[in-house]
Curated annotation (Swiss-Prot):
Belongs to the ClpS family. Involved in the modulation of the specificity of the ClpAP-mediated ATP-dependent protein degradation. This is ATP-dependent Clp protease adapter protein ClpS. The lineage of its organism: Bacteria, Pseudomonadati, Pseudomonadota, Gammaproteobacteria, Enterobacterales. Binds to the N-terminal domain of the chaperone ClpA. InterPro entries: ClpS, ClpS_core, Ribosomal_bL12_C/ClpS-like. It comes from Salmonella gallinarum (strain 287/91 / NCTC 13346). Pfam families: ClpS.
Amino acid sequence: MGKTNDWLDFDQLVEDSVRDALKPPSMYKVILVNDDYTPMEFVIDVLQKFFSYDVERATQLMFAVHYQGKAICGVFTAEVAETKVAMVNKYARENEHPLLCTLEKA
């Protein structure tokens, strides 16, 4: 009798593991935050360089950042979002701009 229960427990464990492995990853919004010092052209450059937007869409997003205070640049898995945030913030500091890029759970 104990062996049947052991197999049922094992089957449940495998089923739970497979279900957990198949869950979609958590997604995160990458957000640019407005400031009074970063040039609009630099924000457009960031949107093209790190998010692959064409100049028209990058300009639209830049104006959203400017007038609304922030804008979502994209939604990514945690690892991709963290990498993009780090790269944008590093690039902004290297170019002596206070532009801030953040992430939040989608």
